[in-house]
Each structure stands twice: as C-alpha cells, then as structure tokens.
C-alpha cells in the first residue's frame, strides 16, 4: 500500500578539525548496499536510476562517526525503505540543527529539491545568509526542479513515497498505477504527471510516458528536469530524432551555475547514448557520460572498445581518451592520444586544449600559446581562451591577459575561471569577483581559499575559518589550506599552532616559498 514520500540524497557533515573550533564540511554518505545501475546491463536502467543514488563518500574527520552522520544515515535508510514521513522529519531536524554554513545550506537545497522534498529545500534556502554566493544556485534549483503547483505537505509526502517505490523498491508498476488513480492530483500537479512519466518509462510504457511528460511540461514549461526526462523518454522510443530535437532545446536552457551545466551535459550524453544506433558512437557517448560523472576508469574501459573504422568517430574517441588520461595525470598517454586526434582533425579543440595544457605544464609557453590560439577558434567553452590568457600572464603580458578575460566575461556568464583570474588582477574588486566565482561554481576550491585570504587580511577570522573549512572539504590534501590556517592562527597570536600548520604545509610541499618565509627557512 502506498502512503506518501520521496527519493535520494547526498549530504554533508560538520566535523571539528582543530582545537580552536574549526568546522569542516563533510560529504554525503555512501550507504553501501546500493550501486549505480550499469547502462550496459541487459536490463537497461534510466538516467534517474544511474544518478539518483546516495553515492557520495563521507570525508574523514575527527568526528566522522558523530551524531550528524548517524542522523543522515538513518534518514536516508528510512527514505529508501519508503518510511518517508519519518525520513522527512529527520532531514528537517538536520537542516535546523546543522552548524550554520551557506555552503552546506546550498547543497542541502539542491539535494532536497532533487528528491522532491521541496518544502525542505525552501527551509534550507531560507537559512542562507550571503545571496552573492547563493543566488545563482537557488535560481537554478528552482528552474531545474521546482513544480509550478505548490503541493501541500500531505501530497508532497504521498508523491515522495511514490518516487521512493519507483526508485528503490522495485514497485514502479504498482506505484505508477496507484498514482494514475489520483485524478484530482494529476489534474492539479505538474510534478505528479512527471512521476507518472518517469514510472511509465521505467516500466517500458513509452506511450504513457510521452503523454504524461507532455502534460507535465504544459503545466510547467520552465522546468528543465521535465524537459530532460522528455528527451530521455523519446530516446527510448521509435522516434530518436525527436529525442535529439528535445536535447538541442535542453542545450539552450537558462542555467547559471557549473553545477547544473555539468548535470545537463552529463544527462545529454546519457540520452545520446540511449538514442545512438551506431555501436561505436553509442560507446563514445557512454564514455563521455562517465567522464562527466568523474568515473575515469569506467570511461577509459568503454573508450578502449570504441575505436571504429570511421575516422570521424575515432577523432572524438581519441580526443576524449586524451582528456581522461590528462585527468588521471598520465600525461604521456594524454599527449599520444591528443596527437592521434589532431592527425585526423587538426582543428579538434578538445585535443588541442590537452596539448596546450601539457605544454603549459612543461613551461613551453610558445607551444602552449600556439595550441590554445588554434583551439579557441572552435572552443565554445572558452577554456582555450582562459588558458591562453594564463600563458600571457606567465609571459608578463598582464594587459593582454586582462583583455581576454574581459572579452570572455562580456559573452559568457558562466566563465568562473575568468572571474577568478580577474579577482587576482583587480584588487579593488577582488571580493566581488571571488564571490561571483563561487556563485557560478561552489565547488571551486581556489575561490574559497582566496576568500579566506581576503578575510584573514581584514582580520575577520571567523569568516576566514568558515571559508577554509569549505576549501578543506573540497580537497583535504591541499597544502595551501595549512598555510592559510597558519596565517589565521598567527593573526590570533597562536604562534605555536601557526608554526605547526606551516610545517604541515611544507611537509606536503617542501618547495612552497610562502610557508618557508613564515618559518624563516
């Protein structure tokens, strides 16, 4: 029997790190038993099956077994077991009791909306203090997930349990059939029709899925997630060309943040994988999906079986393989595959960018400049132009670098790296540019570190601690964290603690000159 509830989440934990009350933000929990669906399985899953899993790993910290972790684990287990009312209350308590942090609230806002706990997303959103950092993500969450028809709590929990049963309990047919009996709810609610479409697709009833998703979109034409599902539904129909049409519409969606931009690209690759008829092209898109998801080993395994007799496919396979190897820090292999790609297509921007990055890494500025200039002609992401400006900075041509960054910012609202570089070049606008950087990409660690530096210089140590905590969560092995924490402790007069952190920084990077200077080495 179906009651009322919702479905998946990733979450954060606050853990103490230093004796001076430092709070670190840890990630969502891996509940262990459920693994992402393998799209190559004989019984294919959906994009929702693949991504809607509690798969984030808990970051280690001194309180990694604390009550907050246990609280989250219990809430998520209840949700997956369709004990949605109790799960809702547990998540609500977590939002209300977590140590205040805009970063944590931003993530909770996104994750609660993604599972249909819209009122909890609003609760988390209401606790955010700095709109300069959170505003863009909040707007994306609303455009991507929020229904146009505001559900009362009873209906919200009911639909959440429908989703839970479709998603986790192998009751998609029963749950969908039950929901289709709720005439009043389907008449009013766009989200209810979305769930019928999702459940019907999962059951293989593509005709009903098409009908229901069209109703959902008619009721809420701004919802990006509905449009994403529509493209996926048609990719599994006998009308794949229509799926590609809808996918192209998705590509022009009004997205503000890298978080959702990446989500759309990832789901787009999954839809292309579903729609492709050529086996090699199918594998290429599946590999790109894994690459977008950070599953580099899986991407590489698929790419190794993607080489075909057609050069127009191979050039893209070689370019993507070079990107995977570069991210795996296997630079020689990355270079080899990038060269293979440009042997087929000399203007392949992805391969040229990889070659430029390798040249820049080797301090061959002339070669890097050549590669990035050539790549920028076809690169719509502005990555090549940003890297070209970095080359000019290394050549002490700051004027030329600023011209490029300014040009990018005139045409792109999501070029967070350009905002970041401008922050470092224009100190009178540094804080505003850094906050814009973080607003576009909340997971960009360098932005948080530099915000901490700005606050340390102002003597605003509490703010600096908060920013440092976020930076440490993103990469707990970054030596710069210990350097800036050392500066903070030094500013507070805790010289022994400061010294220990400078020493830790040098243990991690013996060549880091600022830490050497602090220790007078």
Residue ranges and their predicted role:
Residues 67, 76, 101, 110, 135, 161-163, 189, 198, ...:
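Residue-level recognition of tetratricopeptide repeat
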Residues 80, 114, 168, 202, ...:
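Register position in tetratricopeptide repeats
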Residues 63, 97, 131, 185-186, ...:
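Structural marker of alpha-solenoid helical repeat scaffolds
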Residues 70, 104, 138, 158, ...:
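TPR alpha-solenoid repeat register
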């Amino acid at each position: 029997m179906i009651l009322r509830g919702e479905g998946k989440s990733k979450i954060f934990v606050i853990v103490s790190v230093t004796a001076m009350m430092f709070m670190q933000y840890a990630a969502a929990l891996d509940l262990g038993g459920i693994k992402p669906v393998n799209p190559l399985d004989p019984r294919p899953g959906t994009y929702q099956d693949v991504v809607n899993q509690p798969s984030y790993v808990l970051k280690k910290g001194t309180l990694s077994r604390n009550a907050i972790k246990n609280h989250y684990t219990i809430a998520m287990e209840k949700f997956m077991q369709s004990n949605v009312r109790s799960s809702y209350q547990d998540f609500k308590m977590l939002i209300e009791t977590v140590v205040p942090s805009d970063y944590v609230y931003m993530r909770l806002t996104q994750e609660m909306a993604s599972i249909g706990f819209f009122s909890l997303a609003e609760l988390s959103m209401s606790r955010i203090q700095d709109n300069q950092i959170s505003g863009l993500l909040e707007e994306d969450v609303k455009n991507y997930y929020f229904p146009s028809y505001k559900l009362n709590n009873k209906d919200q929990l009911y639909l959440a349990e429908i989703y839970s049963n479709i998603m986790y309990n192998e009751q998609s047919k029963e749950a969908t059939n039950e929901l289709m009996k709720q005439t009043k709810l389907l008449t009013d609610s766009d989200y209810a029709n979305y769930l019928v479409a999702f459940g019907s697709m999962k059951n293989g009833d593509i005709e009903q899925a098409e009908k229901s998703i069209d109703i959902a979109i008619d009721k809420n034409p701004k919802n990006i997630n509905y449009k994403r599902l529509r493209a996926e539904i048609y990719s599994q129909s006998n009308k794949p060309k229509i799926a590609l049409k809808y996918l192209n519409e998705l590509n022009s969606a009004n997205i503000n943040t890298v978080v959702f931009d990446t989500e759309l690209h990832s789901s787009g690759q999954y839809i292309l994988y579903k729609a492709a008829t050529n086996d090699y092209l199918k594998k290429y898109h599946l590999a790109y999906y894994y690459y977008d998801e950070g599953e580099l080993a899986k991407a590489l395994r698929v790419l190794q079986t993607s080489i075909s007799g057609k050069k127009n496919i191979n050039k893209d396979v070689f370019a993507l393989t070079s990107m995977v190897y570069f991210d795996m820090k296997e630079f020689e292999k990355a270079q080899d595959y990038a060269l293979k790609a440009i042997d087929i297509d000399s203007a392949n921007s992805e391969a040229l960018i990889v070659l430029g990055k390798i040249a820049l890494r080797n301090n061959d500025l002339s070669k890097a400049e050549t590669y990035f200039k050539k790549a920028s002609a076809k690169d719509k992401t502005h990555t090549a132009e940003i890297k070209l400006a970095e080359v000019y900075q290394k050549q002490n041509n700051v004027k030329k670098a600023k011209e490029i960054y300014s040009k990018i910012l005139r045409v792109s609202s999501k070029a967070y790296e350009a905002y970041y570089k401008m922050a470092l070049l224009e100190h009178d606008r540094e804080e505003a540019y850094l906050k814009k950087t973080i607003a576009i990409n909340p997971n960009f660690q360098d932005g948080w570190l530099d915000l901490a530096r700005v606050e340390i210089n102002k003597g605003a140590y509490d703010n600096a601690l908060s920013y440092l905590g976020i930076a440490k969560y993103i990469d707990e092995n970054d030596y710069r964290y210990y350097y800036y924490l050392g500066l903070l402790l030094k500013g507070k007069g805790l010289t022994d603690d400061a010294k220990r952190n400078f020493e830790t920084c040098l243990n991690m990077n013996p060549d880091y000159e600022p830490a050497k200077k602090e220790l007078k080495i």
